[in-house]
Design a protein with these regions (language model features):
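C-terminal flanking tails of non-heme Fe-dependent oxygenases
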Residues: 1-91, 96, 139-140, 144-333
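Core domains of carbohydrate- and sulfate-ester-processing enzymes
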Residues: 86-117
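A short, charged helix-loop
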Residues: 107-137
Length: 333
């Protein structure tokens, strides 16, 4: 059985205090290199803001099924909208959860035959007519967390001895923002406990807001350990592109969610902060590279320097029904 475990806890407000800044950067460096996961406090997002988005997350999943299916992601060539329980795949197996996927609110692109297919990942969201306040709250939340994530990314670069603005151009103008509202509806009838299967996030930074139920587990010392919820903190983890951009110096860590027991429901709101789809990710300069071990490549999961190719691959593999309906030519991505 996994044992209880506490991740490193970092207070982002210490970065603004000259007396504490050096210690904060040291702790951030260690957490990003050794663990790839941390609890983040001092981020400026209020308890009321967090409570509100969790309240509306619960309200969305309390809507009649017909209202949720009206915004099904099967309606969207941009992979936006509601995914029914068991209709998302991780590692080829069904996840026992349902969710609403939201990105930056942008017009549908005109994608020509010679344009990169990842341009389809931009476009409008789908919003439930029965819960009109959801749009404003989620988009505001997305903007708030993008600012927190960008600040944290800059501090992380400083912590490893790199220029703070190294990734600013890659995130300029149209960063790829993505928020999920997720429900884990208790145990699956089959007895399987895969709320979401083991995986690494393939992008840059993830900031997770979770309720009090728990279920997140992270690999440490060769086994999975529990990550109990910490009130007022986001769980932050690094994605594979940060590991690649630092030649394996920083760590992207496998994690999963175990379904809650019985009829207990778990709600969470992960936010993913990633660069423009057309951004090409280069190696971060710095003396740290002398200690970088390099990256082990997985032939079954190739990672590309151009961010959008990774993002598209992830969506096609996780939501094959959407891909078959709108993008059958991408089945082999």
């Amino acid at each position: 059985m996994p044992s209880a475990h506490t991740l490193p806890v970092l207070d982002l407000s210490q970065a603004d205090d000259p007396a504490q800044r050096a210690d904060f950067l040291k702790q951030l460096h260690a957490a990003a290199r050794d663990t790839g996961f941390l609890h983040l406090t001092g981020h400026g997002v209020t308890a009321a803001e967090s409570a509100r988005i969790l309240e509306l997350t619960r309200a969305f999943f309390a809507l009649p099924e017909a209202d949720r299916l009206a915004v099904s992601n099967l309606n969207s060539p941009h992979f936006r909208g509601y995914t029914r329980i068991g209709h998302e795949l991780t590692g080829g197996a069904s996840d026992w959860r349902d969710q609403l996927d939201v990105g930056a609110e942008r017009p549908a692109p005109v994608v020509g035959p010679d344009d990169p297919a990842f341009l389809w990942l931009e476009g409008p969201n789908q919003w439930p007519a029965a819960l009109p306040e959801l749009r404003t709250v989620v988009l505001d939340w997305q903007s708030r967390l993008a600012a927190v994530a960008h600040r944290l990314l800059q501090e992380l670069l400083v912590a490893i001895g790199a220029p703070a603005d190294f990734f600013d151009e890659a995130f300029a103008e149209r960063p790829h923002l993505h928020t999920k509202l997720i429900r884990y509806p208790g145990s699956a009838p089959s007895g399987a406990d895969q709320g979401v299967g083991a995986h690494k996030d393939y992008g840059f930074l993830t900031l997770l807001l979770q309720d009090s139920v728990g279920g997140l587990q992270v690999v440490r010392d060769g086994g999975y350990v529990d990550v109990p919820p910490m009130p007022g903190a986001f769980v932050v983890n690094l994605g594979e592109l940060l590991e690649i951009a630092t030649e394996g110096y920083l760590t992207a860590t496998d994690h999963r969610v175990v379904s809650p027991p019985g009829a207990v429901e778990r709600y969470s709101v992960p936010f993913f902060y990633n660069p423009r789809l057309d951004a090409v990710i280069e190696t971060v300069p710095g003396e740290y590279l002398r200690s970088a071990p390099g990256v082990a490549h997985d032939d079954s999961n190739p990672l590309h320097a151009q961010y959008g190719r990774n993002e598209l691959k992830g969506w096609v593999r996780a939501h094959p029904a959407v891909a078959r309906r709108w993008h059958p030519e991408l089945a082999s991505v």
